[in-house]
Regions:
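Short, surface-exposed binding/anchoring microloops in extracellular/periplasmic proteins
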Residues: 12
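C-terminal accessory helical subdomains adjacent to catalytic cores in phosphodiester-
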Residues: 1-9, 20-42, 51-160
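Helix N-cap/beta->alpha junction signal
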Residues: 15-16
């Protein structure tokens, strides 16, 4: 299902299938009336491919579509520089509408701690809806704090 490009909407570009399942779990919790305002895109196949697709397939569209928001959902692979490496590639004109989120190591570690990917995604969405951060406080997710604050400000009103 594609989004209505004339209304504020959110695309999620997942690195791998585990991240796609997290995003799907999140999407299942989005308010029914807002379901078409979010779309989980096909798996990119690695964080570098997420960055490549962002640059080649999404930057121009985001420049033309002011209602578009994009979540780059990547594994941080315990790399403190991963966020900055991606953020430096985001053009300043669209930076407030691009969000970089992910598990600090890999989603598999989060799955062992919290359950299925869709269950985790669902819990993260419920936190956003209820303006709490219970699931987001997990040690493998808490590095997302700054992006989560921005996400709650810009994306939460679109989906919840």
């Amino acid at each position: 299902m594609s989004v209505n490009r004339d209304r504020p909407h959110v695309l999620v570009l997942p690195e791998d299938d585990a991240n796609r399942q997290l995003a799907t779990g999140f999407h299942l919790e989005v308010d029914f009336a807002s379901q078409r305002q979010m779309q989980v895109l096909p798996v990119a196949g690695g964080w570098m491919e997420v960055l490549n697709r962002f640059m080649t397939e999404h930057v121009d569209n985001m420049m033309r579509l002011p209602n578009r928001h994009l979540v780059l959902l990547v594994d941080f692979d315990n790399r403190p520089d991963r966020f900055d490496r991606i953020r430096t590639e985001v053009p300043p004109e669209i930076s407030e509408r691009v969000f970089i989120l992910g598990v600090w190591s890999e989603p598999e570690a989060l799955k062992q701690a919290l359950g299925s990917y869709e269950t985790i995604g669902s819990a993260l969405a419920k936190d956003c809806r209820e303006k709490i951060d219970k699931a987001w406080r997990h040690e493998l997710l808490r590095h997302n704090r700054g992006e989560l604050d921005r996400l709650n400000q810009h994306v939460r009103p679109i989906l919840f």
